[in-house]
Amino acid sequence: MPETIGVFVAWPYANGDLHLGHVAGVYIPADTFARYHRLRGNRVLMVSGSDAHGTPITVAAEREGVTPEDIFRRYHGRFLETYQQLGISFDLFTHTHTANHFRVAQDIFRTLYEKGYIFTQTQIQLYCEYDRRFLPDRYVEGTCPYCGYPNARGDQCDNCGRTLDAIDLIDPRCRLCGQRPLPRETEHFFFDLPAFTDRLLAYLERQTHWRPNVQHFVRNFIQDGLKPRPVSRDLEWGIPLPIPGYEHKVMYVWFEAVIGYLSASIEWSLAEGQPEVWQVWWRDPRARGYYFIGKDNIPFHAIIWPAELMGYDESLNLPYDIPANEFLNLEGQQFSTSRNWAIWVPDFLSRYAPDPLRDYLTSIAPETRDSEFTWQGFVERNNNELLATWGNLVHRILTFVQARFEGRVPEPGALDGRDHLLLDQIAAGFQRIGDLYARVELKAAQREAMALAREVNRYLDEKAPWFQIREDRAAAATTLFVALRAIDSLKLLLAPILPFTSEQLHRLLGYRDRLFGDIVIEPGPETGGHEVLRYRPAASEGRDRWAPSELEAGRPLPPPQPLYQKLEESVIEEERQRLLAQSR
């Protein structure tokens, strides 16, 4: 029976382009996972959107002298194009500045307030006398009181992952003017997180399938003692509080952004013309929701969002899994947008194809510890693995069939033990590799699939059809038939990671249907419209296609084309110099 799988993906702040650190830790893993489940015929809903609110957007707007809406709409549009080019197949990628999201977020806030889970309290907050304003979270930087990191933000330390209150920073400084702000009293709303301690601990105990890094972080976070969390801010840009007399305050972005998973599911439902179908993913206890995030977002998704759901409506499904990734570094340093030490995805895709990037980032995915992107690693992976092990294998099989078997799948004779051994190994790989994809062990799935590609190379070298055909054409035909079935199967095993070239190989193997659908940019469902990204499924989806090849003899094959191109070694130094030049 098909499974119901929610793929809920972290919402990027719409204040700058996406860099490779973003896509390595969140978007490529989420898309790989979603594509696997679509190949299984499961019912998948993958949603996210641009985070349009919060101080990163207002800080960028003030720096440029434009409105926050100008900033978020600019980068929201760029996100849509980037995800489309990279093949990130969101069923819906929207943003948080929609009437639908306002409505859902305000309903949750109001309900929690009426139930007593949100209360008002006077708070000490940093105030800049020079700028004459309170300084919410990212308007302040300083030294982390826990790890000593000198550039911690007022809401979180990127070094140790702790959530912070700006008032706790050592030597705080205003990001607008650089001066030291002073503490002042202001009234704010707080979420009573301690009220959920027992329920959160019970929930955590059931999540034995979570990654160890996530389990340990959450357990330590709860055992350190939960504290009420502020849920309002003194800003003009954001979602107004739905409490009479407090409409001049807005919701704290960490509180309302996670609500986007629910509101985006509802928006997708509305766009589909089935206003209630979102409940299949949110109320059916058999449905499973997977949240793809970076490790810095663990507390918001593993503690705060579950608590919001518990307090708002206990019939809503809590996160089933949170496969949070560690961080990706770049050429020996952390990614830094302020220093421009980053590889921006639009820039990368202007020079290189998407599948080699997806392949390399999967091979170095920071699943359990930080990892590193290097240009040398990218070039070597492209040339020595993707091209040499997989691309060349496909090309030499297809060109041989085109040249010596009139471009048709050869008619095999009786298969011998070596033929059966290879096909049995690949058939067994569907269960083993499928289980790895399902457990979000994507590096291991890729490793196993590439190991099978090496087995096919060994098989060809042993059988040597280029020699067989001189003396026994039937034996060569059998070898090529087995090899074609092998690469047809491997095409599926690698398709979640390599959607573009797997689709290309699907056509080269004579198929007329498609593995995957289209990713389109179109108006959203609200009057007046806002642009969204939508995945339009292929006609072949909805059934389980995760099975070994049944490619039939006699099928005509189109002229072969190479799947990948070799990268020159000179690329390494050229790209390193480009990176150094832009970061100066």
UniProtKB/Swiss-Prot annotation:
Q: Quick one: where is this thing mainly located? A: cytoplasm
Which residues are listed as membrane-spanning?
Answer: none
Locus of motif 'KMSKS' region: 334-338
Q: Where does Zn(2+) bind?
A: C144, C147, C157, C160
How does the cofactor bind to this protein, according to its record?
Binds 1 zinc ion per subunit.
The Gene Ontology CC terms held by the record are: cytosol
Using the UniProt record, name the top-level EC class of this enzyme in a single word. ligase
Which is a GO BP term held by this UniProt record? methionyl-tRNA aminoacylation
Family of the protein in this entry? Belongs to the class-I aminoacyl-tRNA synthetase family. MetG type 1 subfamily.
Query: What is the annotated quaternary arrangement, including any partners?
Result: Monomer.
The name under which this protein is listed is Methionine--tRNA ligase
Specify the species. Thermomicrobium roseum (strain ATCC 27502 / DSM 5159 / P-2)
Task: Give the classification, highest ranks.
Answer: Bacteria, Pseudomonadati, Thermomicrobiota, Thermomicrobia, Thermomicrobiales
- What gene, per UniProt, encodes this protein? metG
